[in-house]
Amino acid sequence: MIRVEDASIGTVWVTCLLAVGLYFIRSRLLSDQFAGFPSVNSRKPWEVLNVFAHRRFQQNGPEYLKAGFAKSPVFGVVTDLGPKLVVSGAFIEDFKDEKLLDHYRAMVEDFMAEVPGFESMFLGNLHNTVLRDVISVITRELDQFTLPLSDEVSTALGDTWSDSPDWTEVTLLPSMLGLIARVSSLIFVGEPLCRDPAWLETVVNFTIVRHQAILALHMCPAVLRPVLHWFLPPCQKLRREIKTARSLINSALEELRKNPPTDRFSSLAWVDAFASGKKYDATMVQLRLANASIHSSADLLAKVLINLCEQPGLIQDLRDEVISVLEENGWRASTLNQLKLLDSVLKESQRLHPITTGTFSRFTRQNIKLTNGTEIPTGTPVMVTNDVAGDAAIYPDPEVFDGYRYLRMREGADKARAPFTTTGQNHLGFGYGKYACPGRFFAATEIKIALCHMLLKYEWRLVKDSPHDMLTSGFASFRDPRARIEVRRRAPDPQEVVLTIK
């Protein structure tokens, strides 16, 4: 193997030029792969690399998707994750046979899963088994987690939002990230690490830095990425975050092995026992859990709170529902399933403002023929989008936030599709099929618990003139991270005193 320090300048230059040439040829072949399909945001004739098209899509993704769908339900586009054949979610059923699709290759291409520092997506068969099984255990044991999660939410909100009866200003998204990171970590790593500021900062930063590093690598020719990732600042920063996490996890594991827990579940302890001495990377397992859960849940929670600020009348209806259901049933996972209006508000927020419109990324293993007759060739990078969420034929007034939308659906023929955690062809917020988000039941539980505490114990309102518009980056959409709200502890009504909420 030729090391950079041993190679002559000429050798390095020739290697780089060959790599760029191969990248150019590969890019042209990918462009030809979309021949016969309408396209938007194609590389300009004078653009040798895709970097400019990547940046355009990152800055104006929704506009390019709108322009593409105006041409056809299937079209080619250079995205910030590379060239994709975008397909309307109306055809999601045509992709239900996973044997025809390559999920792993899509993860490798989209998220650089085989680059050092990005391995949290895939770590071999043991790690995939561990992650699948630990999520199954968490889902199965949600009832036993409900009270501990409620206690942690109560304490964390007191720290984050304070218990002052006076209006206190907070920046919304950071406060939600801190809350969700702490509550999730109670189940993921247990006490006391779940409250360690260094751990909480690391798991929040990891996803942000990882996303920045992925986008940076997508700007580079694919053949140069195995070298360039060692030098790109976002990639170097990502490895520093992993190093910090590894130190914290190793210390926690050492303590766990000395004093095994007997009365409280944590995935860190469970996974260590499950591995039964087999070699595995506990740090990357935990970072994968954090990457999949913290930002998506915090994002949805922030969007819900702003939606409620804009429709304050809905808050009292939600508050009344929480009081009624908790008085009758107490804190149990099954109780949360009875909060049907709250469930509707969550699903409507996700429908109107999904964290990403690109919900289903695959490579085709074989030619796939859509129900409209369109044939997609083997080896095509496909992105099925959640555009059906804005289809007026499915959702009347789709651009309007209607917190009661899915509550009404429970009374009709489509009632089975109404629950927040239910996936289907008309709602792809949690993905679809075999690889639909397995952690959605835990996410729904912790978000509902957090909102119960907020509704019964706090009032909140937007700070006047605070920016809170929806912003986009590529396929992603999010509320302005500068959005600020004012919160204060509310005096409960007499009938609320009986509730077992701290």
Swiss-Prot record:
<feature type="binding site" description="axial binding residue">
    <location>
        <position position="437"/>
    </location>
    <ligand>
        <name>heme</name>
    </ligand>
</feature>
<dbReference type="GO" id="GO:0016705">
    <property type="term" value="F:oxidoreductase activity, acting on paired donors, with incorporation or reduction of molecular oxygen"/>
</dbReference>
<feature type="glycosylation site" description="N-linked (GlcNAc...) asparagine">
    <location>
        <position position="372"/>
    </location>
</feature>
<dbReference type="GO" id="GO:0016020">
    <property type="term" value="C:membrane"/>
</dbReference>
<keyword id="KW-0349">Heme</keyword>
<comment type="function">
    <text>Cytochrome P450 monooxygenase; part of the gene cluster that mediates the biosynthesis of pyripyropene A, a specific human acyl-coenzyme A:cholesterol acyltransferase 2 inhibitor. The first step of the pathway is the synthesis of nicotinyl-CoA from nicotinic acid by the nicotinic acid-CoA ligase pyr1. Nicotinyl-CoA is then a substrate of polyketide synthase pyr2 to produce 4-hydroxy-6-(3-pyridinyl)-2H-pyran-2-one (HPPO) which is further prenylated by the polyprenyl transferase pyr6 to yield farnesyl-HPPO.</text>
</comment>
<dbReference type="InterPro" id="IPR002403">
    <property type="entry name" value="Cyt_P450_E_grp-IV"/>
</dbReference>
<comment type="pathway">
    <text>Secondary metabolite biosynthesis; terpenoid biosynthesis.</text>
</comment>
<feature type="glycosylation site" description="N-linked (GlcNAc...) asparagine">
    <location>
        <position position="205"/>
    </location>
</feature>
<keyword id="KW-0560">Oxidoreductase</keyword>
<comment type="similarity">
    <text>Belongs to the cytochrome P450 family.</text>
</comment>
<keyword id="KW-0325">Glycoprotein</keyword>
<keyword id="KW-1133">Transmembrane helix</keyword>
<dbReference type="Pfam" id="PF00067">
    <property type="entry name" value="p450"/>
</dbReference>
<keyword id="KW-0408">Iron</keyword>
<dbReference type="GO" id="GO:0019748">
    <property type="term" value="P:secondary metabolic process"/>
</dbReference>
<dbReference type="InterPro" id="IPR001128">
    <property type="entry name" value="Cyt_P450"/>
</dbReference>
<dbReference type="InterPro" id="IPR036396">
    <property type="entry name" value="Cyt_P450_sf"/>
</dbReference>
<feature type="transmembrane region" description="Helical">
    <location>
        <begin position="5"/>
        <end position="25"/>
    </location>
</feature>
<dbReference type="GO" id="GO:0005506">
    <property type="term" value="F:iron ion binding"/>
</dbReference>
<dbReference type="GO" id="GO:0004497">
    <property type="term" value="F:monooxygenase activity"/>
</dbReference>
<keyword id="KW-0479">Metal-binding</keyword>
<feature type="glycosylation site" description="N-linked (GlcNAc...) asparagine">
    <location>
        <position position="291"/>
    </location>
</feature>
<keyword id="KW-0503">Monooxygenase</keyword>
<keyword id="KW-0812">Transmembrane</keyword>
<dbReference type="GO" id="GO:0016114">
    <property type="term" value="P:terpenoid biosynthetic process"/>
</dbReference>
<dbReference type="GO" id="GO:0020037">
    <property type="term" value="F:heme binding"/>
</dbReference>
<keyword id="KW-0472">Membrane</keyword>
<protein>
    <recommendedName>
        <fullName>Cytochrome P450 monooxygenase pyr9</fullName>
        <ecNumber>1.-.-.-</ecNumber>
    </recommendedName>
</protein>
